[in-house]
Amino acid sequence: VFRNGIKEYLDGEIGRFDEKAPGFLDRFMGSRPQVFLDILESVIYEVARKGEGVIIGHGSQMLLRNFDCAFHVRVFSSDQRRIDNMAAQQGLSREATLKLIRKRDQEQSGFFNFAFHLEMNDPSLYDLIIHTEKLDVDTAAGLIIQAARSECLRTCSLNALEAMDRLALEKRVHAALLESGQDMNTIIVEVPEKGTVHVYGIS
């Protein structure tokens, strides 16, 4: 769902970014990072607003942490299991596969730390953590589905949905002002209600 959102909402240079792509952090650091972050956050909120979707990574565990209707899952496995799976899927040597895994891990970790000043493996960011060393994909998926359908999880209230709308609009306005060359250190953007934007500046 998130990738569809990216295609729908992003284009041009920023649309090329992918949290998991090799070389991401190098490109990210040299390409107006705050504009990218604003648009990324806006897309996360817009996609989440539609409901019943799956967002993979991209800081969603941080951005949606205050919404009770968002269920955050971390799935991980041993390096050995990851190497075996990727080597078989992509036909790479074990040495090349290990280098690629290390590179992607560093890029994801670097992105998350830069964007949110947190470590993405912090267990407090997740509602469910699954180690797939002894579980196959279907079993792990079944655990996630069962938990997501639990009565313990709340559906998104109207207030939560409206908050996502306002946050998405706020981030888009913030990005547009940055793109126009405004000094955002002297500007405050507020969205008190859907469709209404207040911009305050200090001259």
Segments predicted by a language model, with ranges:
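Short, polar loop motifs at secondary-structure junctions
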Residues: 57-62
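Short hinge/gating elements
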Residues: 22-31, 86, 129, 155-160
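ATP-dependent small-molecule kinase phosphotransfer cores
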Residues: 1-52, 92
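Signal for well-folded cores of large energy- and translation-related assemblies
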Residues: 48, 64-65, 87, 102, ...
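Conserved phosphate-donor/acceptor-positioning beta-strand/loop module used by diverse small-molecule
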Residues: 66-87, 94-99
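Small-molecule kinase domains that catalyze NTP-dependent phosphoryl transfer to phosphate-bearing small molecules
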Residues: 2-19, 94-137, 165, 175, ...
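N-terminal targeting leaders
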Residues: 114, 118-123, 129, 134-203
